[in-house]
């Protein structure tokens, strides 16, 4: 299917282009419950176009750029197949959500033929809405169509609620099931004056539906905020609207920004920070569980690891290991230590006749010799001369090797660093994070975007935009 140049092009809608097609307006479409005086000025529609840029749509700095965008060459207006269909931005004929919806559809079909309205790829939106015009963006509010009124005010009427609720699909709300009502063939003809007379009653009915739907949306958000993944959504339904022109819409305030330092980041998760918050609790729990235990072998009440013997009785770590290795209980009485070689009574050196030495050795004949005489004989194969005998035992101070010096110095530096980190607050500590996150808590309410994260800024600034043809990336995004 090819779209002829004379047919409406992409985004060529009177609500978006400041009502350049006055013949497409009809009194039957005047069922919007917002007054024109409450609408935003056209300059603030820039926020909505910034949101559309994150979804693959072209970004326009002001309505003048939007009007200039439609003047691209007819060669670029040929769209093959349904690949450029934007079902969540363009209206679909199968939306029997409201009583006045069929009249709006019939009036739109009679005055403005748009091939998008019969696209087989269109699908129902997440929230009920009435069409503000053929191919116009769907409004999240029931009956918040932007077809009535002239100028850019009507475009804001339909664009602002859409931008406010565009990210609500992130919350996982199931769509409201549509009523099993097929479009009445009697109302699909040309629009009649009866549609304009029914506009007032439809507006009153849609006001009630809007209030009911908003209450259900607030309750759904409260139920959603009960989950552990979204603790900051509990205040969404209770915050008064301060920035949005519609007083009944709850503005989004990032309440979870104040809890970043305590709930999202653990103080011990960074280098040099204190131990994690759950370690003292686990230690106290382990100590409380181990209280009252006693080793059945040695009677010890404190041990790094409690073990059990074959009968299930508690053993300390030492007794348990001894029993495991030797197969018998660990002896309670320490064996007498063997007398050291230096303190052997009655032993004297066969060479120098000394009785004190650090180590007793034996010569080739098997006679005991002192350490000095034994080493001398081992090195020179001659007995040590008696002139070298000294009364005191000479010990030398061994020089530390470079490896041992480096290892010792590294250990000392690490200890000093850990002490400094514990004394002073780390830059990654909870206090520092709270200080950095403090400006986040004072952000203005997100009244134009329902995303949890702020909308990313466009890659190209608005001043350098070229209005020749849309970027291929937006076309690829449109397929999804």
From Swiss-Prot:
A zinc finger (GATA-type) spans 295-319, 349-373. One of its GO terms (molecular function) is C2H2 zinc finger domain binding. Its main location: nucleus. It comes from the Eukaryota. GO terms for biological process: brown fat cell differentiation; cell differentiation in hindbrain; cell fate commitment; cell fate determination; central nervous system neuron development; cochlea development; commitment of neuronal cell to specific neuron type in forebrain; definitive hemopoiesis. The keyword Heme does not apply. GO terms for cellular component: cytoplasm; nucleoplasm; nucleus; transcription regulator complex. There is a cross-link at residue 389 (Glycyl lysine isopeptide (Lys-Gly) (interchain with G-Cter in SUMO2)). It holds the Pfam family GATA. Residues 143-153 have a biased composition (Gly residues). It is linked to Immunodeficiency 21: An immunodeficiency disease characterized by profoundly decreased or absent monocytes, B-lymphocytes, natural killer lymphocytes, and circulating and tissue dendritic cells, with little or no effect on T-cell numbers. Clinical features of DCML include susceptibility to disseminated non-tuberculous mycobacterial infections, papillomavirus infections, opportunistic fungal infections, and pulmonary alveolar proteinosis. Interacts with BRD3. Interacts with AR and CCAR1. Interacts with MDFIC. Transcriptional activator which regulates endothelin-1 gene expression in endothelial cells. Binds to the consensus sequence 5'-AGATAG-3'. This is Endothelial transcription factor GATA-2. It comes from Homo sapiens. The lineage of its organism: Eukaryota, Metazoa, Chordata, Craniata, Vertebrata. The gene is GATA2.
């Amino acid at each position: 299917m090819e779209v002829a140049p004379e047919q409406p092009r992409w985004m060529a809608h009177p609500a978006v282009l400041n009502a350049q097609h006055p013949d497409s307006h009809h009194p039957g479409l005047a069922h919007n419950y917002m007054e024109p005086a409450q609408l935003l000025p056209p300059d603030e529609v820039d926020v909505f176009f910034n949101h559309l840029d994150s979804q693959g749509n072209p970004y326009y700095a002001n309505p003048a750029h939007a009007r200039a965008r439609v003047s691209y060459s007819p060669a670029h207006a040929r769209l093959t197949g349904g690949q450029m269909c934007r079902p969540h931005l363009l209206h679909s004929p199968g939306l029997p959500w409201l009583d006045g919806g069929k009249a709006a559809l019939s009036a739109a079909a009679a005055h403005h033929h748009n091939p998008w309205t019969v696209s087989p790829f269109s699908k129902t939106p997440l929230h009920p809405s009435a069409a503000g015009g053929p191919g116009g963006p769907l409004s999240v509010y029931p009956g918040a169509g932007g077809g009535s009124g002239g100028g850019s005010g009507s475009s804001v009427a339909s664009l602002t609620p859409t931008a406010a609720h565009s990210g609500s699909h992130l919350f996982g709300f199931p769509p409201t099931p549509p009523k099993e009502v097929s479009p009445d063939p009697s109302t699909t003809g040309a629009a009649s004056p009866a549609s304009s007379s029914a506009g007032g009653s439809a507006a009153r009915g849609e006001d009630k539906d809007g209030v009911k739907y908003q209450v259900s949306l607030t309750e759904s958000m409260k139920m959603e905020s009960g989950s552990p993944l979204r603790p900051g959504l509990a205040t969404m339904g209770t915050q008064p609207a301060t920035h949005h022109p519609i007083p009944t819409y709850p503005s989004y305030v990032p309440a979870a920004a104040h809890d970043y330092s305590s709930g999202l980041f653990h103080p011990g998760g960074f280098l040099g920070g204190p131990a994690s918050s759950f370690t003292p609790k686990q230690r106290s729990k382990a100590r409380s569980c181990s209280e009252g235990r006693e080793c059945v072998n040695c009677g010890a009440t404190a041990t790094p690891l409690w073990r059990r013997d074959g009968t299930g009785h508690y053993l300390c770590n030492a007794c348990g290991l001894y029993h495991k290795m030797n197969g018998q209980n660990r002896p309670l009485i320490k064996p007498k230590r063997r007398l050291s070689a230096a303190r052997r009574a009655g032993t004297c050196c066969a060479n120098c006749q000394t009785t004190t030495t650090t180590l007793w050795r034996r010569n080739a004949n098997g006679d005991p010799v002192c350490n000095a005489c034994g080493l001398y004989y081992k090195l020179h194969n001659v007995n040590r001369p008696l002139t070298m005998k000294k009364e005191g035992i000479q010990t030398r101070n061994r020089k530390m090797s470079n490896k041992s010096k480096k290892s010792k110095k590294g250990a000392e530096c690490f200890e000093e660093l850990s002490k400094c980190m514990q004394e002073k607050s780390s830059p990654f500590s909870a206090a520092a994070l709270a200080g950095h996150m403090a400006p986040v808590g004072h952000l203005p309410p997100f009244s134009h975007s329902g995303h949890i994260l702020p909308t990313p800024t466009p890659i190209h600034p608005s001043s350098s935009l070229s209005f020749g043809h849309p970027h291929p990336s937006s076309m690829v995004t449109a397929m999804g």
